[in-house]
Structures are given as structure tokens and as C-alpha cells.
Amino acid sequence: MSDLTSAASVLAAALAVGLAAIGPGIGQGTAAGQAVEGIARQPEAEGKIRGTLLLSLAFMEALTIYGLVVALVLLFANPFAG
């Protein structure tokens, strides 16, 4: 693998993980804040809100895991290296 390909792969892996974490991080913070607000307004709906929140957080976290998988592929099973 050439030095340029290796450097580009490391940079792309870092960008993949970093950018994949930004969106879900913002979304998870917003969702958790709205859930706390909803529970404060309707305490009797706490169980339903919490269940929906946890499911939503799991789906959001999956996006970050996809970014990590892309980064690992670029670092260890690089399709661009000859």
C-alpha cells in the first residue's frame, strides 16, 4: 500500500467516525431532553415515554456503529489498497 493511500485511509477513517457521531449525538441529546420534558408534563406516561426513548436511542446509536464499521474496513480491510 502506498503512503498516500495509507494516509488517505487513516484520514477517511477518522472523518467517518467523527462525522458519524455528530448527528446521532445531537439527536440523542434532543430526544432525551424532550423525553424529560414529556415526563415532567405527564408523569403517568413515564413508562411509555421511556420505552419509546430507549428504542429511538438504539436506532440513533446504530448510525454511529455504522460509521465505526466503515472506519474499521478502511483501516484493516482497505478495498483501495492493491
From Swiss-Prot:
Show the SUPFAM superfamilies listed in the entry. F1F0 ATP synthase subunit C
User: CDD domains per the record?
Assistant: ATP-synt_Fo_c_ATPH
Pfam families given in the database record = ATP-synt_C (PF00137)
Instruction: Name its cellular compartments.
Output: Cellular thylakoid membrane
Q: Which residues cross the membrane?
A: 7-27, 57-77
Q: What is its main location?
A: membrane
| UniProt GO molecular function | lipid binding; proton-transporting ATP synthase activity, rotational mechanism
List the residues marked with site Reversibly protonated during proton transport: 61
InterPro entries listed in its UniProt record: ATP_synth_csu_bac/chlpt (IPR005953), ATP_synth_F0_csu (IPR000454), ATP_synth_F0_csu_DDCD_BS (IPR020537), ATP_synth_F0_csu_sf (IPR038662), ATPase_proteolipid_c-like_dom (IPR002379), F/V-ATP_Csub_sf (IPR035921)
Task: Provide GO CC annotations from the record.
Answer: plasma membrane-derived thylakoid membrane; proton-transporting ATP synthase complex; proton-transporting two-sector ATPase complex, proton-transporting domain
- Swiss-Prot/TrEMBL keywords: ATP synthesis, CF(0), Hydrogen ion transport, Ion transport, Lipid-binding, Membrane, Thylakoid, Transmembrane, Transmembrane helix, Transport
Membrane topology of this protein = Multi-pass membrane protein
Subunit composition and interactions: F-type ATPases have 2 components, F(1) - the catalytic core - and F(0) - the membrane proton channel. F(1) has five subunits: alpha(3), beta(3), gamma(1), delta(1), epsilon(1). F(0) has four main subunits: a(1), b(1), b'(1) and c(10-14). The alpha and beta chains form an alternating ring which encloses part of the gamma chain. F(1) is attached to F(0) by a central stalk formed by the gamma and epsilon chains, while a peripheral stalk is formed by the delta, b and b' chains.
- Similarity comment: family membership: Belongs to the ATPase C chain family.
What is the documented function of this protein? Answer: F(1)F(0) ATP synthase produces ATP from ADP in the presence of a proton or sodium gradient. F-type ATPases consist of two structural domains, F(1) containing the extramembraneous catalytic core and F(0) containing the membrane proton channel, linked together by a central stalk and a peripheral stalk. During catalysis, ATP synthesis in the catalytic domain of F(1) is coupled via a rotary mechanism of the central stalk subunits to proton translocation. Key component of the F(0) channel; it plays a direct role in translocation across the membrane. A homomeric c-ring of between 10-14 subunits forms the central stalk rotor element with the F(1) delta and epsilon subunits.
Put simply, this protein is called ATP synthase subunit c
Q: Which gene encodes it?
A: atpE
